[in-house]
C-alpha cells in the first residue's frame, strides 16, 4: 500500500501550524489545475486490487562492515559498500538446478554454506514451517547427508562459523557441522502444550513479535532458549472448512489466553554447546526470574547477549507496569549463570504501562559495562537514558517534547537513533547521531538530504556501523541510498523508483494534507487525502479511516497506494484520519489517557474531530462515513453505536466487540483484569453490544474471516446476535477460512470491491 502524496498545509484556508515542504508536483496533477481540462485517467479500484503500480524496494543483507548481499534477477550479488563494485555470490542457475522454488536463503557467517528455504507453510502472523537444504559453496553442491527434517519451525546459523540450531516438533536441535547428525537439546516438546525454542500464540503475537525463542551468544559458544508451558491455557476452537469435498470441517485448536484467563508459564535456559557430543547427555542451565516478578504471573519480554559470558534478561509482571532487567554472568567453575541485585534495573510506570508495547531493549557498550535504553523521562516523553550495569540511576542523553523511536546503532564514539523531533511532526522520522562524550553534539543525518521528498526514514547499518542504508518512505516516492558513517556522504542511490514516477505522471493522483486541530485544549494531528483538483468551495463526502488503538499512529508522511487512493482519485471522496487521545509518539500524557478505559476517549475524539471536519466548509455533512479494521473496527463500531448523529454509515472489519474475548497480554496491558477487585466495570461498559440499539440510526457493514486466530469470529458473531436481538437492520459478510488479514487473492479483491459498493451506495455515488 503505497501512495504518491503531496503534503499540503494550510491549503484549505486553515492556519498551518508547522511547515511541511511539498513533494515535487510531478507526482501530482501535472499540467493543469483545471479538472475539466485534465484528460489523464484516475487511479482505479482495479489499479489497487491488481497492483498496477508497484513500488520497488531495495532489501539488502549486511554480511560484514563493508559488504552486503542483494538478490537481483535471481542472482545473489555481493556488493562492496566502499567501492560500489559487485560480484556474483551465487548464480541464478544454482536455483534452477534445485528442482524447487525457494522462498528465502541464508548464508552462514563464514560464507561456506547457504541455507535454502522451501515448502513454506504459513501458520500465524510470524510463524511458519518450511523445508531446508544446505548448499556447500566450496563444493558447489547440496549436502545430502543428515538432512534437516521437513516442517521445521525455525532455524538459525550461529553468529560465527556455521553451526545451526533449529526447532522441529517443538524441540531444539543443534548441528555442529552441516553434514553431521544433529544433537537433540530438548525432549519435552509437545504440540499445543510445551514449546521449546519457539513461541506459543500469545508470545508470538504480543510479546516478541516473532516465532523464534532461540538466542546464540556472540561467538556461538552458548545457545539460550525459552520454554513455554501452555498446559493450563484454555483453547480457542474454530472450524476450518477447507475444500468442499471435506464432509466434516476440521477443528483448529489453539492455546489462547483471554483476559483474566490462565497464562502460559515461561522458563529460560542456556546450553554450553562445547559440551555437545553424540554420546553425552545435554545439560541446560535454568536462569530463574528475579523474586520481584517471580512472586506472581509474569512474562519474559527481552533477551540480549551482552558479551560471550554475560546475558541480559528482561522480565515484566502480568500487569505490565513493572519490568526488570537482570544481567547474569557465567561462572566457568560451576557452569552456572549468576545474577546480582546490583545488576538489576527496574522500570515502573505510574500512569499506564511500561514501554510502548513492551519495554525497550537495552543496547550495551562493547565492554558490557553500560547500556542505553529508551524509557519515559519525567515529562513523559520516550528518550534515551545511559545506565551503568552496576548502578540503578541513569543519565538521559536526549530530551524534548518529542520522542526517540528506536536506537539504530552504537559505536565507541556515537549512538545513532530515529526520532520524530524534526519540525515538531510526530508523524515524521529522521536519523540522528549523538556524540557520546558530549551529549550536546547531535546531528540530524537525514533532515536536509531531500526535505521535499523524504520526511519518514528508517536505517540499516553494517555490522560495525561503518556504512548505512537510508530508506525514505515518503511523502514522495520511496528512495534508497547508501552512506558512509565517517563522512555522512551519500555514496550512491540504490533505488529511486524513477520508473514508477514516470508512470504516475499519466494519472490524476490525490494530495495529502497534514494539520492540527484543538481538542480539550490540546493540539492533535490529522491528515486528509484530497481528490485531484480539490476545490474548497465544493462539498465532498468524507470517510474517516480509523485505528486509534493504544500507541497507534495513522497520521504520518509515508507514501502509500491504497484503497484510499482510489476513493479520493476516482470517487472524489475525502479520506481523513486523526490521532487523538491514546495515540503514540507524542508523550505518555496523550498515550496513557485511555489507560484502564478502552472505548472511551479514543472513541469520543474521533467523533469530535469529525464534527470539526464537517464545519470546514468543504465536507458534505450528510455524507460522512467511518471504517476500520481490528481495533479500528472496534472504534468504528463504538463510534456508530454512540448515537452522535454525525455519521451516516460505517464498515467494521474483524472488530473486537468485547475485551474479555481478546488475548490477555494485549488487553490487560491497557485494561487490567476483568475482576470486581480490578477493572470489571470498564470491561462491561466498553462492549459494542451494549450500544446495539443506536445502530438503528446508521447503515452498518460488519465483516469477519471465519478462521481469524487473532480477533476470533466469536467477536462478530456475538455482536451480530446483539444487533439482531435489538431489531437492527444491518449488512454482514464473512470470509470462509480467512484469517485476520483476509489476504488471500480472491478474498482481498472481494472485500474491497464489496466495501466500495457499500460506500458508494451510502454516499449515493454512481
Swiss-Prot record:
Keywords: Aminopeptidase, Cell adhesion, Cell junction, Cell membrane, Cell projection, Disulfide bond, Glycoprotein, Hydrolase, Membrane, Protease, Secreted, Serine protease, Signal-anchor, Transmembrane, Transmembrane helix. Residues 28-766 are extracellular. The active site is at residues 630, 708, 740. Pfam families: DPPIV_N, DPPIV_rep, Peptidase_S9. It is found in: Cell membrane; Apical cell membrane; Cell projection, Invadopodium membrane; Cell projection, Lamellipodium membrane. The keyword Disulfide bond applies. Gene3D superfamilies: alpha/beta hydrolase, Dipeptidylpeptidase IV, N-terminal domain. It is an enzyme of class 3 (hydrolase). Cell surface glycoprotein receptor involved in the costimulatory signal essential for T-cell receptor (TCR)-mediated T-cell activation. Acts as a positive regulator of T-cell coactivation, by binding at least ADA, CAV1, IGF2R, and PTPRC. Its binding to CAV1 and CARD11 induces T-cell proliferation and NF-kappa-B activation in a T-cell receptor/CD3-dependent manner. Its interaction with ADA also regulates lymphocyte-epithelial cell adhesion. This is Dipeptidyl peptidase 4. It comes from Sus scrofa (Pig).
Amino acid at each position: 500500500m503505497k501512495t504518491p502524496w503531496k503534503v499540503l498545509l494550510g491549503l484549505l484556508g486553515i492556519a498551518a501550524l508547522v511547515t511541511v515542504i511539498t513533494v515535487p508536483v510531478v507526482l501530482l496533477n501535472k499540467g493543469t489545475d483545471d479538472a475539466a481540462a485534465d484528460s489523464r485517467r484516475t487511479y482505479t479500484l482495479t489499479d489497487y486490487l491488481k497492483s498496477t503500480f508497484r513500488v520497488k524496494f531495495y532489501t539488502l543483507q549486511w554480511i560484514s562492515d563493508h559488504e552486503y548481499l542483494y538478490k537481483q534477477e535471481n542472482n545473489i550479488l555481493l556488493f562492496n559498500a566502499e567501492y560500489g563494485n559487485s560480484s556474483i555470490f551465487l548464480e541464478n542457475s544454482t536455483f534452477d538446478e534445485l528442482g524447487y522454488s525457494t522462498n528465502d536463503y541464508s548464508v552462514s557467517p563464514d560464507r561456506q554454506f547457504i541455507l535454502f528455504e522451501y515448502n513454506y507453510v504459513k501458520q500465524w502472523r510470524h510463524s511458519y514451517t518450511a523445508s531446508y537444504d544446505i548448499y556447500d559453496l566450496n563444493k558447489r553442491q547440496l549436502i545430502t547427508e543428515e538432512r534437516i527434517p521437513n516442517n521445521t519451525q525455525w532455524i538459525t546459523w550461529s553468529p560465527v562459523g556455521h553451526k545451526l540450531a533449529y526447532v522441529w516438533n517443538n524441540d531444539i536441535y543443534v548441528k555442529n557441522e552441516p553434514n553431521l547428525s544433529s544433537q537433540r537439546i530438548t525432549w519435552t516438546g509437545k504440540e499445543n502444550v510445551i514449546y521449546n525454542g519457539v513461541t506459543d500464540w500469545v508470545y508470538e503475537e504480543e510479546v516478541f513479535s516473532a516465532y523464534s525463542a532461540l538466542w546464540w551468544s556472540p561467538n556461538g559458544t552458548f545457545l539460550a532458549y525459552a520454554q513455554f508451558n501452555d498446559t493450563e491455557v484454555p483453547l480457542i476452537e474454530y472450524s476450518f472448512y477447507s475444500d468442499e469435498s471435506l464432509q466434516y470441517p476440521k477443528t483448529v485448536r489453539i492455546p489462547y489466553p483471554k483476559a483474566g484467563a490462565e497464562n502460559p508459564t515461561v522458563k529460560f535456559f542456556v546450553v554450553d554447546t562445547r559440551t555437545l557430543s553424540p554420546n553425552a547427555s545435554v545439560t541446560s542451565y535454568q536462569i530463574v526470574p528475579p523474586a520481584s516478578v517471580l512472586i506472581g504471573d509474569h512474562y519474559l519480554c527481552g533477551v540480549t547477549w551482552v558479551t560471550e559470558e554475560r546475558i541480559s534478561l528482561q522480565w515484566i509482571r502480568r500487569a505490565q507496569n513493572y519490568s526488570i532487567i537482570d544481567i547474569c554472568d557465567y561462572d566457568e567453575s560451576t557452569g552456572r549463570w549468576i545474577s546480582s541485585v546490583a545488576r538489576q534495573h527496574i522500570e515502573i510506570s505510574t500512569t499506564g504501562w511500561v514501554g510502548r508495547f513492551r519495554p525497550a531493549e537495552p543496547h550495551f557498550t562493547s565492554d558490557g559495562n553500560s547500556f542505553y535504553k529508551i524509557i519515559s523521562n519525567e515529562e513523559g516523553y520516550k528518550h534515551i537514558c545511559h545506565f551503568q550495569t552496576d548502578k540503578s540511576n541513569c543519565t538521559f542523553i536526549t530530551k524534548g517534547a518529542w520522542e526517540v523511536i528506536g536506537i539504530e546503532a552504537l559505536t565507541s564514539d556515537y549512538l545513532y537513533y530515529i526520532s520524530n523531533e524534526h519540525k515538531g511532526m510526530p508523524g515524521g522520522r529522521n536519523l540522528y547521531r549523538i556524540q557520546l562524550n558530549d551529549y550536546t553534539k547531535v546531528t540530524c543525518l537525514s533532515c536536509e538530504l531531500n526535505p521535499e521528498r523524504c520526511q519518514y526514514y528508517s536505517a540499516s547499518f553494517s555490522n560495525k556501523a561503518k556504512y548505512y542504508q537510508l530508506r525514505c518512505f515518503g511523502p514522495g516516492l520511496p528512495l534508497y541510498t547508501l552512506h558512509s558513517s565517517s563522512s555522512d556522504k551519500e555514496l550512491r542511490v540504490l533505488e529511486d523508483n524513477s520508473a514508477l514516477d514516470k508512470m504516475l505522471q499519466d494519472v490524476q493522483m490525490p494530495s495529502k494534507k497534514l494539520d492540527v486541530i484543538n481538542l480539550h485544549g490540546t493540539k492533535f494531528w490529522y491528515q486528509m487525502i484530497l481528490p485531484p483538483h480539490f476545490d474548497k468551495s465544493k462539498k465532498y463526502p468524507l470517510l474517516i479511516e480509523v485505528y486509534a488503538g493504544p500507541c497507534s499512529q495513522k497520521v504520518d508522511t509515508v507514501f502509500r497506494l491504497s484503497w484510499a487512493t482510489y476513493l479520493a482519485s476516482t470517487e472524489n471522496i475525502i479520506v481523513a484520519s486523526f490521532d487523538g487521545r491514546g495515540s503514540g509518539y507524542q508523550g505518555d500524557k496523550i498515550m496513557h489517557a485511555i489507560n484502564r478505559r478502552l472505548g472511551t476517549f479514543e472513541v469520543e475524539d474521533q467523533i469530535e474531530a469529525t464534527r470539526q471536519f464537517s464545519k470546514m466548509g468543504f465536507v458534505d455533512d450528510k455524507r460522512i462515513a467511518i471504517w476500520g479494521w481490528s481495533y479500528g473496527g472496534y472504534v468504528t463500531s463504538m463510534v456508530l453505536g454512540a448515537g452522535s448523529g454525525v455519521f451516516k454509515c460505517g464498515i467494521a472489519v474483524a472488530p473486537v466487540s468485547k475485551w474479555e474475548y481478546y488475548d490477555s497480554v494485549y488487553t490487560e496491558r491497557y485494561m487490567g483484569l476483568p475482576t470486581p477487585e480490578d477493572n470489571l466495570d470498564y470491561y462491561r461498559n466498553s462492549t459494542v453490544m451494549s450500544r446495539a440499539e443506536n445502530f438503528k440510526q446508521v447503515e452498518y457493514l460488519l465483516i469477519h474471516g471465519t478462521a481469524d486466530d487473532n480477533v476470533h469470529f466469536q467477536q462478530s458473531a456475538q455482536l451480530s446476535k446483539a444487533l439482531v436481538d435489538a431489531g437492527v437492520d444491518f449488512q454482514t459478510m464473512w470470509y470462509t477460512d480467512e484469517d485476520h488479514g483476509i489476504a488471500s487473492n480472491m478474498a482481498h479483491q472481494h472485500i474491497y470491491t464489496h466495501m466500495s459498493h457499500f460506500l458508494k451506495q451510502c454516499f449515493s455515488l454512481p
